[in-house]
Amino acid sequence: MSTNNLSSSASGRFSLSAAALHILAMALMLMDHLWATLLPAQDWLTCAGRLAFPIFAFMAVEGYFHTHSFRKYALLLALFAVLSEVPFDLMYGGTWFYPVHQNVIWTLLLGLLGIHLMETVRKKQKTWLYLLTALLVVLSGTVLGTLSMVDYYGTGVLTIFIFYFFRGRKWWCLAGQLLALYWVNVQLLGGLLYPVHIFGMEFEICQQGLALLALLPIWLYRGRQGYHSKPFQYACYAFYPVHMLILVLILQYLTR
């Protein structure tokens, strides 16, 4: 069996590789951004887009534990965060400089810097020091994410920490991910409520709560990298600023 296959594990169980999750997350993000620019009447696009960030947050944590150099990983994220800011500002603010909202790569970078600090302390094998550091990192990361107005604000940084603390496939890790993401997305973020009719009964579903569905593909990931190459890696990073810039240019052409 080729190691480049995006699905079907060696054990015969269906699984998704890291490459497949990246592609899925990019497709979901594109849907959300199509709604934000060209197709604002198609609410189903932004509903699907709710699944993108949890997948990116999960893969960022996995990337931390699989990278050979955190320094290079962080610098690459910082580079594309800078390159993505103008396209992001144009898309969400309609201007080259929109200081009240920063792009999602800054969110990922803040979360990973916090994880790196916690892991550095954890390796000193002093439990009390690690627990104290973890508490301070979670609090400061959440506050800093909110004050700096990164995408998803402090709750976005907190989502990354959730996948760090509940990393693994033990039942309590999966339960922790589910309960913590419910708290973050439904209780903290909340948002629009959609009426749904099933068997004559009406229910209201929180739009942001659809982010919990991201756990389905995440739980199908079993540590397999799948297809990997330098061009593919950089294409995944470049997709973020490039697709936003293209959408902005199309929108400006259609509305001029």
Regions found by a protein language model. Name each.
Residues 1-256:
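Alpha-helical transmembrane segments and their immediate juxtamembrane cytosolic regions
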